[in-house]
Protein backbone atom coordinates (compact mmCIF):
# COMPACT_ATOMS: atom_id res chain seq x y z
CA UNK A 1 0.00 0.00 0.00
CA UNK A 2 1.40 3.38 -0.98
CA UNK A 3 1.59 6.16 1.59
CA UNK A 4 -0.24 8.76 -0.53
CA UNK A 5 -2.52 8.64 -3.54
CA UNK A 6 -3.59 11.72 -5.48
CA UNK A 7 -7.04 12.11 -7.03
CA UNK A 8 -7.52 14.92 -9.55
CA UNK A 9 -11.13 15.92 -10.11
CA UNK A 10 -11.49 16.86 -13.79
CA UNK A 11 -15.05 15.82 -14.64
CA UNK A 12 -16.62 19.28 -14.87
CA UNK A 13 -18.27 20.70 -17.97
CA UNK A 14 -16.53 24.10 -17.74
CA UNK A 15 -19.57 25.94 -19.09
CA UNK A 16 -18.16 29.36 -18.20
CA UNK A 17 -15.33 28.81 -20.68
CA UNK A 18 -18.04 29.09 -23.38
CA UNK A 19 -16.42 26.44 -25.54
CA UNK A 20 -17.01 22.87 -26.67
CA UNK A 21 -13.45 22.15 -25.60
CA UNK A 22 -13.08 20.59 -22.16
CA UNK A 23 -11.82 23.12 -19.63
CA UNK A 24 -8.88 21.01 -18.46
CA UNK A 25 -7.56 20.81 -22.04
CA UNK A 26 -7.13 24.57 -22.44
CA UNK A 27 -3.43 25.22 -22.76
CA UNK A 28 -1.22 27.25 -20.48
CA UNK A 29 2.23 27.96 -21.89
CA UNK A 30 1.91 25.15 -24.40
CA UNK A 31 0.43 22.36 -22.27
CA UNK A 32 -3.11 21.53 -21.11
CA UNK A 33 -3.81 22.89 -17.63
CA UNK A 34 -4.40 19.31 -16.47
CA UNK A 35 -0.81 18.42 -17.39
CA UNK A 36 0.51 21.14 -15.08
CA UNK A 37 -1.36 19.55 -12.16
CA UNK A 38 -0.35 16.01 -13.11
CA UNK A 39 3.31 17.00 -13.02
CA UNK A 40 2.87 18.33 -9.47
CA UNK A 41 1.04 15.14 -8.46
CA UNK A 42 3.90 12.96 -9.68
CA UNK A 43 6.32 14.95 -7.54
CA UNK A 44 4.38 13.63 -4.53
CA UNK A 45 3.54 10.03 -5.48
CA UNK A 46 3.35 7.52 -8.33
CA UNK A 47 -0.23 6.66 -7.34
CA UNK A 48 -2.11 9.24 -9.41
CA UNK A 49 -5.78 9.07 -10.41
CA UNK A 50 -7.92 11.31 -12.63
CA UNK A 51 -11.72 11.45 -12.62
CA UNK A 52 -13.33 12.51 -15.91
CA UNK A 53 -16.80 12.74 -17.39
CA UNK A 54 -17.27 15.33 -20.15
CA UNK A 55 -15.34 14.42 -23.34
CA UNK A 56 -14.13 11.31 -21.54
CA UNK A 57 -12.45 9.35 -24.34
CA UNK A 58 -10.67 12.36 -25.82
CA UNK A 59 -9.24 13.56 -22.50
CA UNK A 60 -8.34 10.01 -21.49
CA UNK A 61 -6.33 9.45 -24.68
CA UNK A 62 -4.56 12.79 -24.38
CA UNK A 63 -3.63 12.17 -20.74
CA UNK A 64 -2.41 8.61 -21.30
CA UNK A 65 -0.26 9.70 -24.25
CA UNK A 66 1.85 11.77 -21.84
CA UNK A 67 1.20 10.03 -18.50
CA UNK A 68 0.68 6.33 -19.34
CA UNK A 69 0.56 5.17 -15.71
CA UNK A 70 -2.30 7.42 -14.62
CA UNK A 71 -5.44 5.58 -13.53
CA UNK A 72 -8.48 7.06 -15.27
CA UNK A 73 -12.03 6.86 -13.89
CA UNK A 74 -15.33 8.00 -15.36
CA UNK A 75 -17.77 9.70 -13.01
CA UNK A 76 -21.35 8.44 -12.96
CA UNK A 77 -22.60 11.98 -13.33
CA UNK A 78 -26.21 11.01 -13.89
CA UNK A 79 -26.56 9.27 -10.52
CA UNK A 80 -23.76 10.83 -8.49
CA UNK A 81 -23.02 14.41 -9.58
CA UNK A 82 -20.69 16.63 -7.58
CA UNK A 83 -17.21 16.39 -6.09
CA UNK A 84 -18.06 13.59 -3.66
CA UNK A 85 -19.96 11.73 -6.37
CA UNK A 86 -16.74 11.75 -8.41
CA UNK A 87 -15.11 9.52 -5.78
CA UNK A 88 -17.79 6.82 -5.68
CA UNK A 89 -16.07 4.16 -7.79
CA UNK A 90 -12.40 4.91 -7.15
CA UNK A 91 -10.17 2.19 -5.74
CA UNK A 92 -8.86 3.86 -2.56
CA UNK A 93 -5.72 1.93 -1.64
CA UNK A 94 -3.29 4.22 0.18
CA UNK A 95 -2.75 5.44 3.72
CA UNK A 96 -3.68 9.02 2.77
CA UNK A 97 -5.66 10.44 -0.13
CA UNK A 98 -4.92 13.91 -1.50
CA UNK A 99 -7.80 15.36 -3.53
CA UNK A 100 -7.23 18.37 -5.80
CA UNK A 101 -9.16 20.06 -8.60
CA UNK A 102 -8.16 19.79 -12.24
CA UNK A 103 -8.53 23.53 -12.85
CA UNK A 104 -5.86 24.76 -10.39
CA UNK A 105 -2.66 24.75 -12.48
CA UNK A 106 -0.84 27.28 -10.28
CA UNK A 107 -0.76 25.06 -7.19
CA UNK A 108 2.73 24.48 -5.75
CA UNK A 109 4.11 21.07 -4.87
CA UNK A 110 5.40 22.35 -1.51
CA UNK A 111 1.90 23.41 -0.46
CA UNK A 112 0.43 20.06 -1.47
CA UNK A 113 3.12 18.26 0.53
CA UNK A 114 2.33 20.46 3.53
CA UNK A 115 -1.30 19.45 3.20
CA UNK A 116 -0.29 15.78 3.45
CA UNK A 117 1.69 16.16 6.68
CA UNK A 118 0.49 15.45 10.21
CA UNK A 119 -1.74 12.85 11.81
CA UNK A 120 -5.09 14.65 11.62
CA UNK A 121 -7.98 12.79 10.03
CA UNK A 122 -8.63 15.53 7.47
CA UNK A 123 -6.48 18.44 6.36
CA UNK A 124 -8.34 21.18 4.52
CA UNK A 125 -6.67 23.91 2.46
CA UNK A 126 -7.98 27.42 3.23
CA UNK A 127 -7.09 31.03 2.58
CA UNK A 128 -8.50 34.37 3.68
CA UNK A 129 -9.90 36.06 0.61
CA UNK A 130 -10.25 39.80 0.11
CA UNK A 131 -13.20 39.00 -2.13
CA UNK A 132 -14.64 35.59 -1.20
CA UNK A 133 -17.40 35.65 -3.82
CA UNK A 134 -17.74 32.29 -5.57
CA UNK A 135 -15.82 30.26 -2.98
CA UNK A 136 -17.16 27.79 -0.44
CA UNK A 137 -17.05 29.43 3.02
CA UNK A 138 -15.28 27.67 5.88
CA UNK A 139 -17.57 28.29 8.85
CA UNK A 140 -15.85 28.27 12.22
CA UNK A 141 -16.62 29.07 15.84
CA UNK A 142 -13.84 30.07 18.21
CA UNK A 143 -11.31 28.74 15.73
CA UNK A 144 -12.98 25.35 15.37
CA UNK A 145 -14.08 24.38 11.86
CA UNK A 146 -17.78 23.56 11.81
CA UNK A 147 -18.57 23.08 8.13
CA UNK A 148 -18.07 24.31 4.58
CA UNK A 149 -20.96 25.95 2.75
CA UNK A 150 -21.01 26.47 -1.01
CA UNK A 151 -21.66 30.03 -2.24
CA UNK A 152 -25.04 29.12 -3.72
CA UNK A 153 -26.19 27.41 -0.49
CA UNK A 154 -24.85 29.96 2.04
CA UNK A 155 -27.14 32.22 4.06
CA UNK A 156 -26.56 35.94 4.57
CA UNK A 157 -24.41 35.49 7.69
CA UNK A 158 -22.31 32.73 6.13
CA UNK A 159 -21.64 34.86 3.07
CA UNK A 160 -19.85 37.39 5.31
CA UNK A 161 -17.12 34.87 6.13
CA UNK A 162 -13.84 35.36 4.27
CA UNK A 163 -12.13 32.11 5.29
CA UNK A 164 -12.69 30.06 2.18
CA UNK A 165 -12.10 26.56 0.92
CA UNK A 166 -9.08 26.48 -1.40
CA UNK A 167 -10.29 23.23 -2.96
CA UNK A 168 -7.70 20.67 -1.85
CA UNK A 169 -8.07 18.03 0.87
CA UNK A 170 -5.97 15.31 2.42
CA UNK A 171 -7.88 12.48 4.12
CA UNK A 172 -6.73 9.46 6.00
CA UNK A 173 -8.03 6.97 3.48
CA UNK A 174 -9.89 4.84 6.03
CA UNK A 175 -11.73 7.98 7.17
CA UNK A 176 -12.62 8.90 3.59
CA UNK A 177 -14.07 5.42 3.05
CA UNK A 178 -16.23 5.84 6.16
CA UNK A 179 -17.52 9.29 5.26
CA UNK A 180 -18.23 8.98 1.51
CA UNK A 181 -21.36 6.78 1.91
CA UNK A 182 -22.77 9.27 4.43
CA UNK A 183 -22.69 12.29 2.10
CA UNK A 184 -26.17 13.22 0.84
CA UNK A 185 -27.33 15.43 -2.00
CA UNK A 186 -29.64 17.55 0.14
CA UNK A 187 -28.80 20.94 -1.38
CA UNK A 188 -30.12 23.26 -4.06
CA UNK A 189 -28.06 21.62 -6.81
CA UNK A 190 -28.86 18.02 -5.74
CA UNK A 191 -25.14 17.25 -5.89
CA UNK A 192 -22.88 15.25 -3.59
CA UNK A 193 -20.43 17.76 -2.14
CA UNK A 194 -17.07 16.68 -0.78
CA UNK A 195 -17.25 19.76 1.43
CA UNK A 196 -19.97 18.00 3.47
CA UNK A 197 -17.29 15.55 4.63
CA UNK A 198 -16.02 18.16 7.10
CA UNK A 199 -19.36 18.48 8.86
CA UNK A 200 -19.78 14.69 9.00
CA UNK A 201 -16.25 14.28 10.36
CA UNK A 202 -16.91 16.83 13.11
CA UNK A 203 -20.12 15.05 14.06
CA UNK A 204 -18.02 11.91 14.47
CA UNK A 205 -15.53 13.82 16.66
CA UNK A 206 -12.80 13.42 14.08
CA UNK A 207 -9.89 15.83 13.93
CA UNK A 208 -10.04 18.35 11.07
CA UNK A 209 -7.31 20.91 10.53
CA UNK A 210 -7.29 23.98 8.30
CA UNK A 211 -4.00 24.43 6.42
CA UNK A 212 -3.55 27.98 5.20
CA UNK A 213 -2.22 28.31 1.65
CA UNK A 214 -1.49 31.18 -0.73
CA UNK A 215 -4.63 32.39 -2.50
CA UNK A 216 -2.87 33.09 -5.80
CA UNK A 217 -1.61 29.49 -6.04
CA UNK A 218 -5.08 27.99 -5.66
CA UNK A 219 -6.84 30.15 -8.23
CA UNK A 220 -9.43 28.14 -10.12
CA UNK A 221 -9.68 28.62 -13.89
CA UNK A 222 -13.36 29.14 -14.63
CA UNK A 223 -13.29 31.46 -17.65
CA UNK A 224 -10.89 32.68 -20.30
CA UNK A 225 -10.00 35.80 -18.35
CA UNK A 226 -8.77 33.64 -15.46
CA UNK A 227 -6.96 31.49 -18.02
CA UNK A 228 -5.07 34.53 -19.29
CA UNK A 229 -4.18 35.60 -15.74
CA UNK A 230 -2.83 32.13 -14.96
CA UNK A 231 -0.78 32.02 -18.16
CA UNK A 232 0.76 35.41 -17.35
CA UNK A 233 1.77 34.13 -13.91
CA UNK A 234 3.34 30.97 -15.34
CA UNK A 235 5.10 32.98 -18.05
CA UNK A 236 6.63 35.27 -15.44
CA UNK A 237 7.82 32.26 -13.45
CA UNK A 238 9.37 30.64 -16.53
CA UNK A 239 11.17 33.82 -17.59
CA UNK A 240 12.37 34.70 -14.10
CA UNK A 241 13.88 31.23 -13.72
CA UNK A 242 15.56 31.39 -17.14
CA UNK A 243 17.01 34.87 -16.58
CA UNK A 244 18.36 33.84 -13.18
CA UNK A 245 20.04 30.93 -14.97
CA UNK A 246 21.74 33.08 -17.59
CA UNK A 247 19.28 33.74 -20.43
CA UNK A 248 19.31 37.42 -21.46
CA UNK A 249 15.90 38.85 -22.35
CA UNK A 250 15.17 42.30 -23.70
CA UNK A 251 11.70 43.54 -22.72
CA UNK A 252 10.82 40.15 -21.19
CA UNK A 253 7.18 41.15 -20.73
CA UNK A 254 6.81 41.01 -24.54
CA UNK A 255 8.36 37.53 -24.89
CA UNK A 256 6.44 34.22 -24.92
CA UNK A 257 8.20 31.00 -23.87
CA UNK A 258 6.62 27.55 -23.92
CA UNK A 259 6.92 25.58 -20.68
CA UNK A 260 8.56 22.72 -22.62
CA UNK A 261 11.37 24.83 -24.10
CA UNK A 262 14.97 24.31 -22.96
CA UNK A 263 17.87 26.75 -23.05
CA UNK A 264 21.50 25.69 -22.89
CA UNK A 265 24.55 27.91 -22.51
CA UNK A 266 24.45 31.65 -23.19
CA UNK A 267 21.27 32.63 -25.02
CA UNK A 268 19.70 35.97 -25.85
CA UNK A 269 16.06 36.74 -26.66
CA UNK A 270 14.99 40.12 -28.02
CA UNK A 271 11.58 41.76 -27.75
CA UNK A 272 8.41 40.10 -29.10
CA UNK A 273 10.04 36.71 -29.57
CA UNK A 274 7.88 33.57 -29.31
CA UNK A 275 9.41 30.20 -28.40
CA UNK A 276 6.71 27.58 -29.03
CA UNK A 277 6.73 23.86 -28.30
CA UNK A 278 9.63 21.62 -27.30
CA UNK A 279 12.41 23.88 -28.59
CA UNK A 280 16.05 23.52 -27.60
CA UNK A 281 18.06 26.74 -27.92
CA UNK A 282 21.83 26.52 -27.38
CA UNK A 283 24.22 29.48 -27.31
CA UNK A 284 22.08 31.43 -29.76
CA UNK A 285 20.53 34.85 -30.30
CA UNK A 286 16.88 35.13 -31.30
CA UNK A 287 16.20 38.65 -32.55
CA UNK A 288 13.09 40.81 -32.46
CA UNK A 289 9.67 39.43 -33.48
CA UNK A 290 10.94 35.99 -34.48
CA UNK A 291 8.92 32.81 -33.95
CA UNK A 292 10.58 29.46 -33.18
CA UNK A 293 8.47 26.28 -33.17
CA UNK A 294 9.58 22.80 -32.05
CA UNK A 295 13.12 23.20 -33.38
CA UNK A 296 16.73 22.81 -32.25
CA UNK A 297 19.01 25.82 -32.69
CA UNK A 298 22.73 25.74 -31.87
CA UNK A 299 25.31 28.57 -32.04
CA UNK A 300 23.17 30.62 -34.42
CA UNK A 301 21.54 34.01 -34.76
CA UNK A 302 17.95 34.16 -35.94
CA UNK A 303 15.98 37.16 -37.16
CA UNK A 304 14.71 39.75 -36.75
CA UNK A 305 11.24 38.70 -37.95
CA UNK A 306 12.22 35.15 -38.90
CA UNK A 307 9.87 32.17 -38.67
CA UNK A 308 11.38 28.80 -37.78
CA UNK A 309 8.59 26.27 -38.18
CA UNK A 310 8.59 22.75 -36.66
CA UNK A 311 11.30 20.13 -37.08
CA UNK A 312 14.22 22.37 -37.99
CA UNK A 313 17.83 21.69 -36.99
CA UNK A 314 19.93 24.83 -37.29
CA UNK A 315 23.59 25.03 -36.27
CA UNK A 316 26.30 27.69 -36.66
CA UNK A 317 24.02 29.60 -39.02
CA UNK A 318 22.80 33.12 -39.74
CA UNK A 319 19.09 33.38 -40.53
CA UNK A 320 18.03 36.95 -41.33
CA UNK A 321 14.81 38.90 -41.56
CA UNK A 322 11.71 37.49 -43.27
CA UNK A 323 13.26 34.06 -43.71
CA UNK A 324 11.02 31.04 -43.10
CA UNK A 325 12.27 27.49 -42.52
CA UNK A 326 10.26 24.29 -42.15
CA UNK A 327 11.64 20.76 -41.70
CA UNK A 328 15.05 22.15 -42.63
CA UNK A 329 18.43 20.83 -41.54
CA UNK A 330 21.07 23.50 -42.08
CA UNK A 331 24.66 23.80 -40.90
CA UNK A 332 27.04 26.76 -41.21
CA UNK A 333 25.05 28.62 -43.86
CA UNK A 334 23.77 32.15 -44.41
CA UNK A 335 20.22 33.03 -45.45
CA UNK A 336 20.03 36.78 -45.02
CA UNK A 337 16.53 37.76 -46.07
CA UNK A 338 13.22 37.04 -47.79
CA UNK A 339 13.53 33.29 -48.38
CA UNK A 340 11.50 30.12 -47.84
CA UNK A 341 13.49 26.97 -47.11
CA UNK A 342 11.16 24.02 -46.55
CA UNK A 343 11.79 20.26 -46.54
CA UNK A 344 15.48 20.74 -47.24
CA UNK A 345 19.01 19.94 -46.17
CA UNK A 346 21.74 22.54 -46.72
CA UNK A 347 25.41 21.94 -45.94
CA UNK A 348 28.17 24.21 -44.72
CA UNK A 349 29.50 27.23 -46.57
CA UNK A 350 26.36 27.79 -48.63
CA UNK A 351 24.95 31.28 -49.17
CA UNK A 352 21.22 31.56 -49.85
CA UNK A 353 20.41 34.71 -51.82
CA UNK A 354 17.46 37.00 -51.22
CA UNK A 355 14.19 35.64 -52.55
CA UNK A 356 15.26 31.99 -52.75
CA UNK A 357 12.39 29.52 -52.57
CA UNK A 358 12.39 25.75 -52.28
CA UNK A 359 9.26 24.75 -54.20
CA UNK A 360 8.44 21.68 -52.13
CA UNK A 361 4.76 21.02 -52.88
CA UNK A 362 3.12 19.99 -56.15
CA UNK A 363 -0.45 20.08 -54.88
CA UNK A 364 -0.40 16.41 -53.86
CA UNK A 365 2.71 15.76 -51.78
CA UNK A 366 5.87 17.32 -50.39
CA UNK A 367 9.36 16.79 -51.83
CA UNK A 368 12.84 17.47 -50.47
CA UNK A 369 15.69 19.65 -51.69
CA UNK A 370 19.33 18.75 -50.99
CA UNK A 371 22.02 21.41 -51.26
CA UNK A 372 25.70 20.60 -50.79
CA UNK A 373 28.70 22.55 -49.50
CA UNK A 374 29.88 25.98 -50.68
CA UNK A 375 26.92 26.60 -52.95
CA UNK A 376 26.18 30.19 -53.96
CA UNK A 377 22.49 30.68 -54.73
CA UNK A 378 21.72 33.92 -56.53
CA UNK A 379 18.75 36.09 -55.65
CA UNK A 380 15.24 35.17 -56.80
CA UNK A 381 16.03 31.50 -57.37
CA UNK A 382 13.37 28.80 -57.34
CA UNK A 383 14.49 25.26 -56.54
CA UNK A 384 11.74 22.89 -57.71
CA UNK A 385 11.86 19.74 -55.60
CA UNK A 386 12.80 16.99 -55.71
CA UNK A 387 16.19 18.36 -56.67
CA UNK A 388 19.81 18.00 -55.55
CA UNK A 389 22.51 20.66 -55.82
CA UNK A 390 25.98 19.20 -55.32
CA UNK A 391 29.04 20.94 -53.81
CA UNK A 392 30.69 24.09 -55.18
CA UNK A 393 27.83 25.15 -57.43
CA UNK A 394 26.95 28.68 -58.56
CA UNK A 395 23.30 29.34 -59.37
CA UNK A 396 22.64 32.50 -61.35
CA UNK A 397 20.12 35.00 -60.03
CA UNK A 398 16.59 34.61 -61.34
CA UNK A 399 16.96 30.92 -62.19
CA UNK A 400 14.33 28.23 -61.88
CA UNK A 401 16.17 24.98 -61.16
CA UNK A 402 14.25 21.81 -62.04
CA UNK A 403 17.14 19.39 -62.62
CA UNK A 404 19.96 18.16 -60.41
CA UNK A 405 23.16 20.23 -60.65
CA UNK A 406 26.55 18.49 -60.70
CA UNK A 407 29.50 19.54 -58.55
CA UNK A 408 31.45 22.58 -59.72
CA UNK A 409 28.80 23.75 -62.22
CA UNK A 410 27.14 27.04 -63.06
CA UNK A 411 23.37 26.63 -63.26
CA UNK A 412 21.41 29.25 -65.15
CA UNK A 413 17.81 29.06 -66.29
CA UNK A 414 16.24 32.26 -67.61
CA UNK A 415 15.12 33.87 -70.86
CA UNK A 416 17.83 35.74 -72.77
CA UNK A 417 17.46 39.50 -72.28
CA UNK A 418 16.48 41.58 -75.31
CA UNK A 419 16.72 45.42 -75.42
CA UNK A 420 14.64 47.39 -77.99
CA UNK A 421 15.99 50.93 -78.57
CA UNK A 422 13.39 53.74 -78.79
CA UNK A 423 10.54 51.54 -77.56
CA UNK A 424 9.65 53.75 -74.57
CA UNK A 425 8.82 56.87 -76.62
CA UNK A 426 7.00 54.87 -79.27
CA UNK A 427 4.90 53.01 -76.71
CA UNK A 428 3.74 56.04 -74.76
CA UNK A 429 3.14 58.09 -77.95
CA UNK A 430 0.68 55.44 -79.13
CA UNK A 431 -1.14 55.60 -75.79
CA UNK A 432 -1.61 59.36 -76.14
Curated annotation (Swiss-Prot):
GO terms for biological process: cell morphogenesis; cell wall organization; lipid A biosynthetic process; peptidoglycan biosynthetic process; regulation of cell shape; UDP-N-acetylglucosamine biosynthetic process. Mg(2+) binds at residues 103, 222. GO terms for molecular function: glucosamine-1-phosphate N-acetyltransferase activity; magnesium ion binding; UDP-N-acetylglucosamine diphosphorylase activity. It catalyses: alpha-D-glucosamine 1-phosphate + acetyl-CoA = N-acetyl-alpha-D-glucosamine 1-phosphate + CoA + H(+); N-acetyl-alpha-D-glucosamine 1-phosphate + UTP + H(+) = UDP-N-acetyl-alpha-D-glucosamine + diphosphate. Acetyl-CoA binds at residues 360-361, 379, 397, 414. It comes from the Bacteria. Residues 225-245 are annotated as: Linker. Residues 246-432 are annotated as: N-acetyltransferase. Binds 1 Mg(2+) ion per subunit. Its main location: cytoplasm. Pathway: Nucleotide-sugar biosynthesis; UDP-N-acetyl-alpha-D-glucosamine biosynthesis; N-acetyl-alpha-D-glucosamine 1-phosphate from alpha-D-glucosamine 6-phosphate (route II): step 2/2; Nucleotide-sugar biosynthesis; UDP-N-acetyl-alpha-D-glucosamine biosynthesis; UDP-N-acetyl-alpha-D-glucosamine from N-acetyl-alpha-D-glucosamine 1-phosphate: step 1/1; Bacterial outer membrane biogenesis; LPS lipid A biosynthesis. Gene3D superfamilies: Hexapeptide repeat proteins (2.160.10.10), Spore Coat Polysaccharide Biosynthesis Protein SpsA, Chain A (3.90.550.10). The active site is at residue 337. InterPro entries: Bifunctional_GlmU (IPR005882), GlmU-like (IPR050065), GlmU_C_LbH (IPR038009), Hexapep (IPR001451), MobA-like_NTP_Trfase (IPR025877), Nucleotide-diphossugar_trans (IPR029044), Trimer_LpxA-like_sf (IPR011004). Its cofactor is Mg(2+). Its EC number is 2.7.7.23, 2.3.1.157. Residues 1-224 are annotated as: Pyrophosphorylase. Keywords: Acyltransferase, Cell shape, Cell wall biogenesis/degradation, Cytoplasm, Magnesium, Metal-binding, Multifunctional enzyme, Nucleotidyltransferase, Peptidoglycan synthesis, Repeat, Transferase. The keyword Magnesium applies. In the N-terminal section; belongs to the N-acetylglucosamine-1-phosphate uridyltransferase family. Catalyzes the last two sequential reactions in the de novo biosynthetic pathway for UDP-N-acetylglucosamine (UDP-GlcNAc). The C-terminal domain catalyzes the transfer of acetyl group from acetyl coenzyme A to glucosamine-1-phosphate (GlcN-1-P) to produce N-acetylglucosamine-1-phosphate (GlcNAc-1-P), which is converted into UDP-GlcNAc by the transfer of uridine 5-monophosphate (from uridine 5-triphosphate), a reaction catalyzed by the N-terminal domain. Homotrimer. PANTHER family: BIFUNCTIONAL PROTEIN GLMU, NUCLEOTIDYL TRANSFERASE. This is Bifunctional protein GlmU. It comes from Campylobacter hominis (strain ATCC BAA-381 / DSM 21671 / CCUG 45161 / LMG 19568 / NCTC 13146 / CH001A).
